[in-house]
């Protein structure tokens, strides 16, 4: 996401995404919402380069919206606190607050009640099945039972985590199930799961070398990439403390 301040109040998207009207773009919505609530007379030009697949369950749109709020908080010299931006971001989507929070977190509610947690350093092999999963359709599925026992802190550990959506998505999208099956036969993984509502799936590794060996063995017909886990958002200091 690249942002350029305008002296007028216009909010302009320079890089529209095919199939997504500008008014539906979360970066545009974030900028307009912050402009309205802050009362600033400034505007912004937004350039967006998508590096991860849409409909992959990776939170790309929410992350872009959070980045827009954090950056404009500084560029427009608003000096809002992290908590204020998180509350505003919740209007854009349940996943936006965690990206503003800027730390690994245990989430409750719809994702807005966040508590920081410490995670060990890790690398992730992310596979991208060639399907687009509709989050709305998955949550509306009769196969989603919603009867999982809630997990609380302090007993929580990553090993206790479970994605209730995974079995529903695998039933509706066999390609997702096939990619998960391939990851589960790998050695030296510490976790294999689906991202959010899919379609992407991932395997966690403690070392970069193990992750790169797994990436090198991805078969023809599958594609993926490596990422390193972060414990702190690089823009975490773009807000006022308190």
Language-model-detected regions and their locations in the chain:
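ATP-dependent small-molecule kinase catalytic core of the GHMP/sugar-kinase superfamily
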Residues: 78-191, 204-242
């Amino acid at each position: 996401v690249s942002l350029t301040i305008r002296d007028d109040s216009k909010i302009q998207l320079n890089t529209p995404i095919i199939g997504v009207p500008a008014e539906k773009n979360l970066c545009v919505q974030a900028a307009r919402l912050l402009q309205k609530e802050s009362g600033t007379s400034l505007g912004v030009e937004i350039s967006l380069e998508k590096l991860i697949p849409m409909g992959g369950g990776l939170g790309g749109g929410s992350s872009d919206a959070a980045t827009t709020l954090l950056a404009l908080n500084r560029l427009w010299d608003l000096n809002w606190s992290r908590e204020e931006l998180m509350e505003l971001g919740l209007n854009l989507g349940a996943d936006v607050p965690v990206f503003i929070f800027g730390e690994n977190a245990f989430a409750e509610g719809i994702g807005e009640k966040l508590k920081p947690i410490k995670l060990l350093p890790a690398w992730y092999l992310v596979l991208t099945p060639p399907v687009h999963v509709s989050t709305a359709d998955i949550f509306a599925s009769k196969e989603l039972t919603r009867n999982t026992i809630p997990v609380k802190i302090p007993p929580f550990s990553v090993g206790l985590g479970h994605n209730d959506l995974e079995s529903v998505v695998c039933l509706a999208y066999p390609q997702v199930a096939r990619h998960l099956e391939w990851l589960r036969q790998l050695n030296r993984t510490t976790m294999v799961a689906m991202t959010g509502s899919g379609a992407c799936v991932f395997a966690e590794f403690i070392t970069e070398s193990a992750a790169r060996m797994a990436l090198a063995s991805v078969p023809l017909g599958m594609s993926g990439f490596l990422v390193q886990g972060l414990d702190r958002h690089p823009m975490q200091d773009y807000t006022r403390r308190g």
